[in-house]
Swiss-Prot record:
Protein name, entry field: Histidinol-phosphate aminotransferase
Top-tier EC class: transferase
Protein EC: 2.6.1.9
Gene (name only): hisC
Location of N6-(pyridoxal phosphate)lysine modifications: K226
Amino acid sequence: MFLSRPELIKKEIFDIAEYVPGKSIEEIASAYGLDPASIIKLGSNENPLGPSPKAVQAMMDTAPFANIYPSADAIELREALSRYTGFPVSNLIASGPGMDGLLDGLCRLVIEKGDEVIVPTPTFAYYELPARACGGKPVFVRRSQDFSIDPEKLLEATSSRTKIIFLCSPNNPSGNLLPEKDLRKVLENTRALVFVDEAYVEFADRNLAELVREYDNLVVGRTFSKVFGLAGLRLGYGIMPEWLAKEYIRAATPFSVSLPALKAGIAALSDVEHRKKSIEIAREGRKYLKEKIPFKVYPSQANFVLVDVSPLKAKAVTQSLMKKGIIVRSCDSFRDAGDTLIRATAGTLEQNEKVVRAFETAKKEV
């Protein structure tokens, strides 16, 4: 007889709120009886151009070698990342699955039962999951009205048990950048690691990675899911002090980056034109959406915009758009985001025009 055995599960696991992803094309097609080919998916901040053709070819070329393990430490990819970022290989970690794998590895490396992590909200929901799984406790600090952080408030929330402070720049779901002076203040007044999530940094005017050369407690996480269009391959990387990278590699799961992901990542880094075009579409798209959507739209440095549909509710407006085959993200699942915010990915001009018309209709009908 097979019985449920919850006593075998770590108690910390039961405190974890399940991660809520954006809706899939299949879900919406089934729910509303739509042709999947007609659906516009702008809820997960994916690249509307798709992956680089060079990356696609590189993936295909690995098929005959599926029986062979990739390099344990993804050294070829790290060498390519060194050329891309300007950092030595000794400062670079490649991670699968995606940047989430980097977060998992970092929490596993430093968090013990009873330790704390600081999470300014609203922000990317995943940070607390690996921390809780390792026995850590998330301490949430509410962002200001404009979604900026108050460094003093953040530092006041730390304690002797604080191991990681999670920051996001551009922040998800608000799209605003973390000022360098605020990051420096946090770094200089804590013994904890400070993790800066730069998943969307290629779309922004500036990055914060260079500070890794100055501070031995700064880690910058990045992904191939956004500008490189490789979300389905689950590939990320970290830029961190050499002392930490050595220990991370010691504790990391070997072969975490698959051979197709490794080769596609190298090829994507080499395709400068695809990257430039992806950035151009995102920047033009977010500008268009900010100007045309008939609700308050926050300034963004990412490949998405945050829309406040007050006095309407985000769920109702999101549902109105989904009925028309347009997937956007209601932000009510983001802690402290409230119930009136919607995140919409910047798509192609044709897609953006349809999104604007759908928001206009929702404003009249919802």
